[in-house]
Amino acid sequence: MAWSAQQYVKFEDERTRPARDLLAQVPLQSLRRAVDLGCGPGNSTELIIERFGAEGVSGLDSDVNMLEAARKRLPGTAFVEADLGSWQPTEPADLLFANAVFQWLPDHLDIFDRLMDGLSPGGVLAVQMPDNLGEASHLAMEESAHAGPWKAAFEEKSVRRQPLAPPSAYYSRLIGKAARIDIWHTIYNHPMADAADIVEWVKGTGLMPYLAHAGEAYREAFLADYLERIEKAYPKMSDGRVMLRFPRIFMVAVKK
């Protein structure tokens, strides 16, 4: 499944805010090496550079389209194609930063444990993941998946991502290697122009696996079914806008 940097950046300000909030809690004054894991189009990498300078900062992603966008955005920064499921730093890093990527990897608890080994003493693993499977935006994806002529494809194979573990599970897994762990949730409330705007948002991320699995022949029909459900789930406010509620989990682990 190929990602679209162009679709992703349609709501760049809203998508970048959690990365900014995560970086604000990183307790480092300086660093020699930082890697932006799942860097996407480079918006989060740019934040790291703004705070710490460009030297020693790099990004990696598995998607060629995202990497191309990141290289255009930050031509002086190294961006590498890599699989986060198996990647490990070749030398100790001071910061491993991951904004909205590990929710796609079911075994991310194991990966976090391994990444802690790739940090220098006092180094930081900083992670943010959407925790929104229980929101109407994502419940409607499952409803649409099993409602149309495409439903046989979803009965054979689910594309719903795995729910996140409870905060206690992340703490328990990391505390053996961490001197300090901060874990918190933030719920963002985004005023959107209308229900179609919510659809445009999730077309860049959570809805993509559903559209790909339904197949190109059913793409527009699936989107129409999904939009109808979103219109019912998100009533208009006094100014005609709708409110997208978006919970996210954050964790910052400092290595012993």
UniProtKB/Swiss-Prot annotation:
Gene3D superfamilies: S-adenosyl-L-methionine-dependent methyltransferases (1.10.150.290), Vaccinia Virus protein VP39 (3.40.50.150). CDD domains: AdoMet_MTases. It comes from Rhizobium etli (strain CIAT 652). The keyword Methyltransferase applies. GO terms for cellular component: cytoplasm. Its EC number is 2.1.1.144. Belongs to the methyltransferase superfamily. Tam family. It catalyses: trans-aconitate + S-adenosyl-L-methionine = (E)-3-(methoxycarbonyl)pent-2-enedioate + S-adenosyl-L-homocysteine. GO terms for biological process: methylation. HAMAP family: Tran_acon_Me_trans (MF_00560). Catalyzes the S-adenosylmethionine monomethyl esterification of trans-aconitate. This is Trans-aconitate 2-methyltransferase. It is found in: Cytoplasm. Keywords: Cytoplasm, Methyltransferase, S-adenosyl-L-methionine, Transferase. Transmembrane segments: none annotated. InterPro entries: Methyltransf_25 (IPR041698), SAM-dependent_MTases_sf (IPR029063), Trans-aconitate_MeTrfase (IPR023506), Trans_acon_MeTrfase_C (IPR023149). GO terms for molecular function: trans-aconitate 2-methyltransferase activity. It holds the Pfam family Methyltransf_25.
